[in-house]
From Swiss-Prot:
This is Quinolinate synthase. It is found in: Cytoplasm. It comes from the Bacteria. It is an enzyme of class 2 (transferase).
Amino acid sequence: MQADTIKQEIRRLLKERNAVLLAHNYMRDEVQEIADITGDSLGLSQEAAKTAADVIVFCGVHFMAESASILSPHKTVLLPRRDAGCPMADMVTVEGLLELKARHPGVPVVTYVNSSAAVKAVSDICCTSANAVKVVNSLPDREVIFVPDRNLGQFVAKQSDKAFHFWDGYCPTHERLKADVVARLKAENPDALFICHPECNPAVVALADHACSTSGMYDYCRKSPAKRFIIGTEAGILYKLRLENPDKEFILASPALVCPNMKLTSLEDILDALTTMAPVVQVPEDIRVQAKRALDRMIAIPRD
C-alpha cells in the first residue's frame, strides 16, 4: 500500500473510531506529519485527556502510553508498537527504589515522567525536563531522591540548594553525545548556538548556550534572533524545528542522536493498531490511582 493511501485510511479510521492521534517530538517525520497533536510525553497525555476522543493512539514509547492511561482511564489507549520501550525507564525498578527509600527514610522521591507507572506509584511527585527545577524547589525538604535520570538530576541540583540522592539511570541516546564532538562543532560553526537537552551528560550541558526540554527548544529557537543552531537532542525534533523556522539552519550535534525505540512506529503500525484496536495499554487501577497522585502533585504547582 502506498504511503498516501495508508494516510487516507488512517484518517478514515481515526474518524470512525473517534480517535485522536498523538505523536511525540522524536517520532519519524511522516508520523509527526499525520498526527493530530505533537509534543512531549506529558503534554500529549494532558491534551488527550481534554479531548472528546474515545480512543488515544499514542505514537511514542510504553511509559508515555501508560501516562495517557493514568490521566484518561475511561479512554482506550493504543500503543502501535508494543515493543517500543525506554531503556532509561527500565533502569529503575520498584524494588530498587523501595530499597533506596528505606536507606533515606522520609526523603521525598521526585520521579521524572520518563518512568513506568509502577515506579510513579511509589513516588511522591513527578517532574518533566521543563519543570524539574521548579518541582524540586517547591518541596520544603532539604533532601530529595531523584530518579531515574542522573543527568537531569545533576542539571537540577546545580539550580537547587538541596542535597540529592541520584538513581544511576540515563538515556542511552543522549549519553552518546560527547563533549569533544560538541566542542569541535562549535569551533567549526562559531555563529551557531548550541542547544541541548538536560538528559545529555553534564560535560555536554556545560557547553550549551541553552539547555531545556523539547518544548523549550521550539520556543527558544523560534524567538532567538540567531539563524544557526546546533541541536543536542534526538533527531526527530528537527522536523518541527525546520517546519516552524524555514529561514534558520539546524545542525544535529551527532548522527548518534537517534533513539531506535522512538523510530519503531511506522504508518503501517498505526494503521494496524486502528484496524485491530490493539495493542491496548491499560494501567491497573491500584497503580493508576497512586501514580496519578504523583502526577497531580506536579500539575498542581503553578506555572510561571
